[in-house]
């Protein structure tokens, strides 16, 4: 069976906004070029919720994974950059899927703006912020894919 390419209409991505306490998850396809928030996972820096991540991988059956890379504004690394890279590497090794690391600078600010514009009350931001940040990261990735937009 030939390998799928990013232009395949069924090429699905699962994206993660990695944090030490919460991990936002989003899904999107190369065909629709649209990312959607899925959920926010709780975990710790050393022990993400691998059971729920495995369930999500099994449910969505992505062809590739996307992880946000929290760089400093000048493009340099920081401790969270290294942690996100390590998380991405663990995902790649566990699930044997291609991994794309994507610059996520300002994604949380964009996510906060999206929630405000959608009228989501501030008290509900915490539960939605990370998954909308993952959506923002994945949307930026999908926007950069080669080929025509739908």
Regions found by a protein language model. Give the residues of each.
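Phosphate- and other anionic-substrate recognition elements at nucleic-acid/protein interfaces
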Residues: 1-16, 20-150
């Amino acid at each position: 069976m030939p390998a799928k390419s990013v232009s395949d209409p069924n090429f699905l991505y699962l994206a993660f906004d990695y944090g030490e306490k919460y991990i936002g998850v989003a899904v999107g396809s190369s065909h629709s070029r649209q990312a959607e928030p899925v959920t926010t996972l709780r975990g710790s820096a050393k022990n993400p919720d691998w059971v729920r991540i495995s369930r999500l991988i099994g449910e969505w059956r992505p062809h590739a994974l996307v992880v946000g890379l929290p760089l400093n504004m000048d493009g340099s690394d920081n401790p969270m950059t290294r942690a996100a890279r390590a998380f991405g590497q663990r995902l790649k090794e566990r699930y044997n899927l291609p991994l794309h690391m994507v610059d996520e600078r300002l994604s949380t600010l964009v996510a906060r703006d999206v929630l405000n514009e959608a009228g989501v009350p501030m008290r509900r931001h915490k539960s939605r912020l990370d998954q909308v940040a993952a959506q923002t990261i994945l949307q930026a990735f999908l926007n950069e894919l080669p080929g025509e937009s739908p």
